[in-house]
Amino acid sequence: NITVGEEVDYYTEVTGGDLAEGEDIRSARFLGDIGYFVTFKQIDPLFSVDLSDPSNPKIIGELKIPGFSDYLHPYGDGKLLGIGLSVDEEVMTTEGVKLSMFDISDPANVKEMSTYVLENVLSTDAGYNYKAVFADAEKNLFGFMAYGDSIEYKMFTYDEAEGFKEVFSKDIVNYGNVRGLYI
């Protein structure tokens, strides 16, 4: 559930109602008065929630998509990058890591602009360690560790006309906390 709270004398007091009841929250991103939440149950919506009045949060948009993003990152004006999993909704099997670019220019009408599935990649660190993702919208680059048949660090660019493009991949043999850096 999504519950809005307010800090009062060193503790949090619930001020808003429950949203997305019965759903597991996979990722969240707050951009001003709007919060974006991806939940997971059977169908995996991306909610946009108006949080300008903490005592009365309102779902203003909902995009139902297959799979889910367990990492969300703003990617330039009006765009939100999602990294997660592509899931076959009928048999509930994972098809690979899914990249999504969302158009959030109108929070009430969020659209998935483009997707790309890395079919031989089963997981990333993005869902549990936000520092594991390198993302620079100005340079149009983002990267992360990818785990599947091998362990690789992958980097991508995004173009509205052509979608996602892998621009770098390096096998990692001895790894710890590998992160990308642009110099």
Predicted ranges, named:
Residues 1-183:
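Feature marking well-ordered beta-strand scaffolds used for ligand recognition
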